[in-house]
From Swiss-Prot:
Region annotation Disordered: where it falls in the sequence: 61-87
Stretches assigned to the Agouti domain: 93-132
Disulfide bonds: C93-C108, C100-C114, C107-C125, C111-C132, C116-C123
Subcellular location: Secreted
Organism: Macaca nigrescens
Protein name: Agouti-signaling protein
Free-text function comment from the UniProt entry: Involved in the regulation of melanogenesis. The binding of ASP to MC1R precludes alpha-MSH initiated signaling and thus blocks production of cAMP, leading to a down-regulation of eumelanogenesis (brown/black pigment) and thus increasing synthesis of pheomelanin (yellow/red pigment).
Residues annotated as glycosylated: N39
SUPFAM superfamilies documented for this protein: Agouti-related protein
Family annotation (PROSITE patterns): AGOUTI_1, AGOUTI_2
Length: 132
């Protein structure tokens, strides 16, 4: 029992000492805040003021029209894509969705590539991108 009480008393003294040392007195905290304020190089008066401007209906309509023009021009640009000329088919090639294991020749479709699954046991020519 005496050993248990001695350990508890030691623990209590240690906790009291730890809490007393970990919290600074209130006077030091105020001095630190003042020194931080005086040492700070950024001053709020250095920044320009911000003004808030209300939009009228006319400005909103113009921005909507401009946005619609941009959208339509982007759509037209995507529609006007020129089809790339296809390379001539070489005689030894693999058709799309057929097996193309590594000793086999390349895929016939220029937009297709050989994809292998299950540790290269099942390979087939597949078209990856629709925009090609």
């Amino acid at each position: 029992m005496d050993v248990t009480r001695l350990l508890l008393a030691t623990l209590l003294v240690f906790l009291c000492f730890f809490t007393a040392c970990s919290h600074p007195p209130p006077g030091e905290k105020l001095r630190d805040d003042r020194s931080l304020r005086s040492n700070s190089s950024v001053n709020l008066l250095d920044f320009p003021s911000v003004s808030i401007v209300a939009l009228n209906k006319n400005s909103k309509q113009i921005s909507r029209k401009e946005a619609e023009k941009k959208r339509s021009s982007k759509k037209e640009a995507s529609m006007k894509k020129v089809a790339r000329p296809r390379t001539p088919l070489s005689a030894p090639c693999v058709a799309t969705r057929d097996s193309c294991k590594p000793p086999a020749p390349a895929c016939c479709d220029p937009c297709a590539s050989c994809q292998c699954r299950f540790f290269r046991s099942a390979c087939s020519c597949r078209v990856l991108s629709l925009n090609c």
